């Protein structure tokens, strides 16, 4: 018989970890100019305080948007911010990660599932996007046919980098 005692089932994260995950998730939305709803903030607080489980928080956010009779343009932005924040909170408190192209596309799918039809897919067309952080200018994006190879190259460079040799006094 195989002994599975060494495999411990992951439980709910602690208060500090949940707080950090929510703050990070909401902060990532702010980078894109998105602001979460007051309802998400209150629901996140309840999750952090242990008044509700994460699954209950996730369901409350989902139900909040399903119950809206009419939608405004602002609702679309808060829906994206709230849903992505909820997904990011979940990802950040899991103790799993695959440093691969498949892992990266899986993260994209899990963050944007229910928000964008293309969640988890590598784009097959070229894009430009006006970035508010660049005062409306755009960055140069990798050409669609080269994305897969560019990601694989970047991941390999990261795998080979030895962070133990970085002077901690020089790091941010």
Which ranges hold each PLM region?
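FIC/Doc superfamily catalytic core
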Residues: 1-172
